[in-house]
Amino acid sequence: MKEKHQIVIWPVYLDANKARNEGRLTPMSCSVKTPRVMEIFKAAEKLGLHPEHVTGKAHPAAWADKSGYVLVDNIGPKTDLLRRIGTEIIRMRGGKQ
């Protein structure tokens, strides 16, 4: 369950295959193609954000995809956290997407 000091990170927020009006919140330079929840979890863990994986939940715009989301500590603006997580996933995948 989400606490006040946590932010929800849905995979669509970092998905380079989605347009901004489809839910992507990061610039293309910090986005990745089809991000997986476990990639987001591992990137947040490496950044020290104390992630929690919540399964069986679907983003309202993609109600059929119940891959879940990741809760991370709220240590700053959401866009900054998303950019850091996206950049870390790119690094984990081995470079530019």
UniProtKB/Swiss-Prot annotation:
GO molecular-function term, one example from the UniProt record: 7S RNA binding
Keywords recorded for this protein, A-Z: Cytoplasm, Ribonucleoprotein, RNA-binding, Signal recognition particle
A GO biological-process term: SRP-dependent cotranslational protein targeting to membrane
Compartment(s): Cytoplasm
One Pfam family cited in the UniProt record for this chain: SRP19
Gene3D superfamilies the UniProt entry points to: Signal recognition particle, SRP19-like subunit
GO CC, one annotated term: signal recognition particle
Record flagged with keyword Signal: no
Purpose: Involved in targeting and insertion of nascent membrane proteins into the cytoplasmic membrane. Binds directly to 7S RNA and mediates binding of the 54 kDa subunit of the SRP.
Family: Belongs to the SRP19 family.
Subunit structure: Part of the signal recognition particle protein translocation system, which is composed of SRP and FtsY. Archaeal SRP consists of a 7S RNA molecule of 300 nucleotides and two protein subunits: SRP54 and SRP19.
Record-given protein name: Signal recognition particle 19 kDa protein
Protein species of origin: Methanocella arvoryzae (strain DSM 22066 / NBRC 105507 / MRE50)
The organism's taxonomic lineage, starting at the top: Archaea, Methanobacteriati, Methanobacteriota, Stenosarchaea group, Methanomicrobia
Underlying gene: srp19
